[in-house]
Swiss-Prot record:
Protein name per the record: Large ribosomal subunit protein uL10
Gene this protein is translated from: rplJ
NCBIfam families: PRK00099.1-1
Taxonomic superkingdom: Bacteria
InterPro entries: Ribosomal_uL10, Ribosomal_uL10-like_sf, Ribosomal_uL10_bac, Ribosomal_uL10_bac_type, Ribosomal_uL10_CS_bac
Function in brief: Forms part of the ribosomal stalk, playing a central role in the interaction of the ribosome with GTP-bound translation factors.
GO molecular function: large ribosomal subunit rRNA binding; structural constituent of ribosome
GO cellular component term of the entry, any: large ribosomal subunit
Transmembrane segments: none
Organism: Aeromonas hydrophila subsp. hydrophila (strain ATCC 7966 / DSM 30187 / BCRC 13018 / CCUG 14551 / JCM 1027 / KCTC 2358 / NCIMB 9240 / NCTC 8049)
Assembly and binders: Part of the ribosomal stalk of the 50S ribosomal subunit. The N-terminus interacts with L11 and the large rRNA to form the base of the stalk. The C-terminus forms an elongated spine to which L12 dimers bind in a sequential fashion forming a multimeric L10(L12)X complex.
Keyword Signal annotated: no
Annotated CDD domains: Ribosomal_L10
């Protein structure tokens, strides 16, 4: 069924709003993936705070115009499934990467983060970004490690001073 002009404008506006509030975007080709599997992917995406939609390339080009995802324009070929991460920058990339492992026909095309185009081969850069909680945990571990090391060095320095004085 052909879309009317009003429907097209509504789609462009909806995707544009999603793009403006998103932290990152990933696009993929879902040809050959069954409806059941796509339904599971959509449900998982909603749970992960990822906006996901299949959009015509011409409408997608208009929707990302003026956003930091304009760099993806050259990758809009063939059927395009776009996902915007709303809560964590790596959420959509991680979701698509896991789904692609289980579904051979699902192909990640590209991604974008902070206006930078990320080719499909480097999508791991985006997928492996730590979540806020993981980053805080790593920071705390580093700080704890540093303070323990500093304590050991301080005690060793005090011991050396006492030995030198004796």
């Amino acid at each position: 069924m052909a879309l009317g002009l009003e429907d097209k404008k509504a789609i462009v506006a909806e995707v544009n709003e999603a793009a403006k509030g998103a932290l990152s975007a990933v696009i993929a080709d879902s040809r050959g993936v069954t409806v059941d599997k796509m339904t599971v992917l959509r449900k998982t995406a909603r749970e992960a705070g990822v906006y996901m939609r299949v959009v015509r390339n011409t409408l997608l080009r208009r929707a990302v115009e003026g956003t930091e995802y304009e760099c993806l324009n050259n990758a809009f070929t063939g059927p395009t499934l776009i996902a915007f991460s709303n809560e964590h920058p790596g959420a959509a990339a991680r979701l698509f990467k896991e789904f692609a492992k289980a579904n051979q026909k699902f192909e990640i095309k590209a991604g974008a983060f902070n206006g930078e185009f990320i080719a499909a081969a480097q999508i791991d850069r985006l997928a492996t970004l730590p979540t806020y909680e993981e980053a805080i945990a790593k920071l705390m571990a580093t700080m704890k490690e540093a303070s323990a090391g500093k304590l050991v060095r301080t005690i060793a320095a005090v011991r050396d001073q006492k030995q030198a004085a004796a």
